[in-house]
Amino acid sequence: MCLVWGKMRILIVESDPDLGQLWQRHMQRQDMETRLEAGQSGAICALQTQYFDIVVLDLVLKQGSAMAVADFASYRHPDTQIIFVTNTSFFSDGSIFALNANTRAFLQSDTPPEDLTAMVAHYTRAV
């Protein structure tokens, strides 16, 4: 958990490198330790070797399945929280919360990065 390392540890899984780097920079400015991965294989590898307080996860990955990443994160690290982001209206009915018990938020990809960072900080403190 964040108390062990002293910094919040965030895994960002986003297929769009520009968007992922934008989020990463905002979180780093808030003294969060971040790792950016573009797809399922990189995210799974990261989760096998490190603990993360939060996973910010693009629901529609170009490489692999976001649900597989979320399931693995929940299995490997039951305290890890998931924030899904998407640029689609898929799951806009809120059903995403029933599919993964660690899901804490579901946001549009165009959410201002400072708002996403504030949500990450909020849910990390809640752990």
Residue ranges of predicted features:
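Two-component/phosphorelay signaling modules centered on CheY-like receiver
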Residues: 17-35
